[in-house]
């Protein structure tokens, strides 16, 4: 989180400190994490990132958390070259991200839930919940069981 500058409203541009808030108090727009990219550029390089373990946590400075807490290696899923689909679409190269091998629940939802669960623990939350009938609920349950 040392490179997080704060939160910015996607609709009106209002800024907030990086704390437990997700909507703008003025317009109820969603808040997005703002980063100090010049500081990141001075501190980290592509070679540093590539030398780290293969999980989403190799990008820690670019994530809105302090340390990985949930213990899952979510996010480092393979890119699969789609030659025939590329030809059909008229593009030179096309790669698809295979999130069916993501951990712990084999869903693309695991990537974002790993980060959300980690941030929730950092903010002191001990109970997690979500409105879902599918993959999101499974991922939240798996991460909550490990995180708390």
Model segments located where?
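PLP-dependent amino-acid enzyme catalytic core
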Residues: 1-148
């Amino acid at each position: 989180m040392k490179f997080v500058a704060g939160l910015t409203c996607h609709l009106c541009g209002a800024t907030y400190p990086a704390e437990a808030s997700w909507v703008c108090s003025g317009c109820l727009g969603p808040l997005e994490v703002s980063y100090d990219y010049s500081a990141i550029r001075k501190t980290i390089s592509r070679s540093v990132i590539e030398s780290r373990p293969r999980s989403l946590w190799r990008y820690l400075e670019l994530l809105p958390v302090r340390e990985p807490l949930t213990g899952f290696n979510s996010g480092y899923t393979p890119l699969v070259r789609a030659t025939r689909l590329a030809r059909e679409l008229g593009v030179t190269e096309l790669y698809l991200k295979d999130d069916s091998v993501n951990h712990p629940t084999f869903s693309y939802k695991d990537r974002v839930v790993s980060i959300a669960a980690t941030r929730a623990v950092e903010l002191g939350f001990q109970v997690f919940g979500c409105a879902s009938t599918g993959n999101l609920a499974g991922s939240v349950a798996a991460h909550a069981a490990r995180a708390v």
